[in-house]
Every structure is written in C-alpha cells, then in structure tokens.
Amino acid sequence: MSLVASLQLILPPRPRSTKLLCSLQSPKQEQELSSTSPPISLLPKLISFALAISLTSFSPALAIPSLSSSQPLTTPFTQSKFVQTGLLNGKIRPCPSTNPGCVSTNPTSSSFSFPLTIPETDTQDPIEKLKEAIMSTQKNPKFVVLEDTPYGRYVEAEVEGGGFSRDVMEFLVKQDVVAYRCMATKVTFVYPFTTAFGDSKGQEERLKKLIDQLGWYAPTFESME
C-alpha cells in the first residue's frame, strides 16, 4: 500500500468550501465548526503512523527470492548435489570440502591418502588387473570411463554405496604409480544444511579390500615411522 493511500484511509476527508460556509454562519456557529476539525497537533502523529504501516507492510516480493534469479546457489547442501569427476589439471581431484565421505591422493585434499605403487614383479596389465579387482570386491560395478590421457590411463567406475546411492571410484595409472579418489555421492547434512555428517571410514574400508586383492603397495603414515 502506498503512502498516499495510507494517508487517505487514516486522515479524515477535507471539508469542501469550509471557508465559504464559515463566512455565512454566526460567530457562535463558526466556533462550533472550528471545534469539530481535528487538532493540528494530531497530524504529525497520524503521518508517522501511516509511514510505519507502509514501511512494515508485508511484501511477498521482498520476502521470497525470485525463481528467475541468476545468482547461483552456494550452500554446502546444493554444492554437494553436483559431483565433479575426471582429471583436474592432469591430476586426480581433491575431495570436496562439503563431502566427508571421500579419500583422495591429491595432496590438497582434506582426507589424504598415499598413491599406490605397483611392484616390479607384477607383469599383468594394471588396468585389466584393476578392473578385475573392482569387479570382485565391489557390488554392482559399472565402468563409466576408460581412457588414455597425456597424464596416464584414467579409470572411473560407479559402485554400490550405502542405501540406494552410487559411489565413485577414480584411478590414474602412470607407469608404476596409481593415484585415486573414492567418494560417496550421497552426503547427509545436519540442519540447517551447513554441516555435513559422516567420515571417510567407509571409503577407507572399500579401498583396503581392493588393495588386498591387487597386492599393490599402499604406503601409510604409520609405515613411515
């Protein structure tokens, strides 16, 4: 409601030709007419009240963001819905900061793990051996990407995760070094969708089964002490 409309509803209507009517009345009647008009001292209060109403009136346009807004949604909850896979600048990607259910060999990752080393005595094709190990240790595996890149041979597979979700396993094999990332695609958030709940233990257990099947060397911080 505009300020003008608010004032029209609150202030009394201005009498028409008041000056002319008063000139035709007796002095006593003029005094009676003047006593019926609102005191001038009330006008500032009425104007302030009208301003307060117009400023505090509920406006849906102000309270609800436009659906056509071009600003991206940047909450951790919405960010976790967009899973980025593939190499980043020729390297395995780090774990997203919004996803605690992840392990990566990228050194910038918050949940870091050392790359695997293929023993010199292992003469089998590493990609074929990796595929066989994934199929024998993981549930319902599906190989999404198998490609040769300038940075090594890249493998991406989807496997069964917790519940009805699918987890992602990525590997980059370059000579005898294997970088990887294992990540859950379903992230649970604590109200109000700013803190992710969980840890990387599930992915670490998945990797342990895979590494035991491969027989490749997996360095740890404990083994370096």
From Swiss-Prot:
Domain of life: Eukaryota
Keyword line: Chloroplast, Plastid, Thylakoid, Transit peptide
Major site of localization recorded for this protein: plastid
GO CC, alphabetical: chloroplast; chloroplast thylakoid lumen; cytosol; thylakoid; thylakoid lumen
Intracellular or extracellular location(s): Plastid, Chloroplast thylakoid lumen
Protein name: Thylakoid lumenal 17.9 kDa protein, chloroplastic
InterPro entries, per the entry: Thylakoid_lumenal_17.9
